[in-house]
Amino acid sequence: MEEDVYKSLYERPFAEQVAFNLEQLHYRYTRLSEIDTTKKENQKEYLLLFDSFLALFRALFLEKGTRQYSIQKYYCEKGQDDIAKKINDYLDSKMFSWTDKTIREVLKFIADKFVCHVDPITNDDLGLANFYMSHLCNPYVDNNLKDIMETIFGLI
């Protein structure tokens, strides 16, 4: 009986939703990576798609608390705490070698200040967001969006 409840809660409908959301995230990332941002006419499309990507990434991986349902919580509920821990450890690792800012903090800063909420921003916030975004789309640096996606998908 308990096994049937477990399957109905975690393997059937929600597992399909998790798979669908991860597929959508991967699709959005793939489309994002195909946009040539050096051409001015592509920059609005890039920002539009980046917002969509980041909102979903935030919902899937950056939520904390008992009321939100992240991928990490999903793995914990399935008894695969080790995967959830690896994801969290990675997201809590340093984004840059010269500061203690984590990958989670950088992505959440952009998502919360510029995508998911309409928070008051300062010129410093805007400059920081521009720096973070230019870093994320730069193929020649560590912890860019490609590295983050490859690492996350490698863990799950």
Provide a role label for each language-model segment.
Residues 1-106, 125-156:
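Amphipathic alpha-helical interface segments
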Residues 119-120:
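Intrinsically disordered, Ser/Thr/Pro-rich regulatory regions of eukaryotic transcription factors
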Residues 105-116:
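Long, charged low-complexity segments
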